[in-house]
Amino acid sequence: MEKQITVYAVSDMTGETVARIVRAASAQFPEGNVTIKVLQHIRTAEQIVDFIEAQSDPGPVAVFHTILAKRTREDLRGALQTMRIPSVDLLGSAAHVMADLLDERPHETPGLTIDDGAEPAYFDLA
């Protein structure tokens, strides 16, 4: 039986990164019916909560996000726990690990990317 879920892909910028990750995860469940709703340019947890509360989703919901501002992430985590909505902090966890390794605080500025021509090194191990 096909189960319907809604995933809110939330971003403080365009939502492109988080939407791609949600689509990649969704592809692993071909029998599931996943609706992805992208929320862009989010600045507060209240914006997300208000949007979710105004929806009438037919099944379970989850929030995947790439919010950079630590305070907003914390507020969002608390609000979603109260609402019993599972969430995945995709960018905050990555920034935390890098901050520890670099012994530096992240800027928490939405939209920053490295455009210096540096490309990652790819290795095909197959």
Model-assigned labels for residue ranges:
Residues 3-6, 32-34, 56-61:
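Short, surface-exposed connector motifs at secondary-structure boundaries
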Residues 10-13, 65-70, 92:
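Structural motif
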Residues 24-33:
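Short helix-loop-beta junction
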Residues 81-126:
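Ser/Thr/Gly-rich flexible loops in soluble cytosolic domains mediating phosphotransfer, phosphorylation
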Residues 37-67, 71-81:
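Metallocofactor- and cofactor-centric catalytic cores in central/energy metabolism, strongly enriched
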Residues 1-21, 25:
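N-terminal accessory targeting/assembly segments
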Residues 1, 32-33, 73, 77-87:
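Non-catalytic terminal and connector segments of soluble metabolic enzymes
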Residues 36-39, 87-89:
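Conserved beta-strand scaffold positions in the cores of enzyme catalytic domains, especially
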